Amino acid sequence: MAVSAARRVAYEVLLRVFEQDAYADRVFRTAARDLDERERAFAQRLSYGAVQRVRTLDYAIDTLGKRPVRKLDPPVRAALRLGAYQLGYTDTAPHAAANESVELVRRARLERAVPFTNAVMRRLTEGIRPLLDSLPDGPLKESYPDWIAETFERDLGHDDALALMRAMNEPLETVVRVVRGDPPLGAEPTDLPGAYRVERVDELAVAEGRIWPQSRGSQLAGLVVGSQDGERVLDLCSAPGGKTSQLRGDVTAVELDPNRANELRENLAKLGATNVTVVEADGTKLPPDLQGFDRALVDAPCSGLGVLGQRPDLRWRATPLPELQLALLRSAAERVRPGGTIVYSVCTINAEENEAVVEASGLEVLPLGEEWPQYAHPRLSQFLLTLPHVHGTSGFFIGRLQV
């Protein structure tokens, strides 16, 4: 029997992500390039949903299949995960999910595993929904590593942690920044200047540099910098360039990775950001001539716990980076003139990478909560913290500091 193009793509994504440590978005872009819009949307839902929910799916397969997932052949493991996701979380016809999972195993030339796959899919068809309903609220039911759930609970409390995990398992708003020209047809204004909600991103408008896909959390970080014409601005860790292109003044954008630096240059040219000079350098070891800046943006690498909804595999590979973040912040402080300001932003919800890094820097905090009260940090109002379950956008911590 045939296997739909969307399921073939989702199966490939599951195989590559969990067996070859590939990145879901990169595999998906390549695998889905020939799909039409409808197939692509279905393939993305299956791919990203199954990757996100894999902890819960594996529990269901272990429980109902009566054989540990880790001991299965990789193609069988991927096919069962795909089938289980459809049965547990979509309205796909059960026979289609089961039959095509079996066919994927057959096509992998694992005929000996076909009866087992068929039997497990039958058990999942009958039992996965009751099993999912019986799970207690928490990281197993919502499919997060325990350490992430514990981090959220420590920083936000039990109820908000649970609401946050649920929110990042569902699609968030799609927002674009209007770079030039009119907003897209049907776009809805938001509370940020130039930021509009859209049903879908107009790829032609992106290619022409008229709009840029960028969450409100990300745009807020760029706005808080507040740079003006005539000022010298340092932007560390700049790629892919969304926030960089928001900055006014004479901007020096630093990026370590040569490939990402090239991507940054291409994006800035597309967006018409002629005020930016790209420098390939380590943000913790800047060239000596980069001195005397009026402002800096340190949009530091982080665990990404605020963008787990947009990056489905990140929850399984996330790593906190407080030492690197502090090194970057201190590096920026050495290059900004006395009295100048630094905006520290990270797309994570983790006190160890957020306020603890700011405190360790020893820099003076300039309060932000009164300027942006709707985004004020719930415990520390001098900072901003966008939260997916509260604001409907990606999670960002933002602090403004004075040298």
Predicted region positions:
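S-adenosylmethionine
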Residues: M1-V403
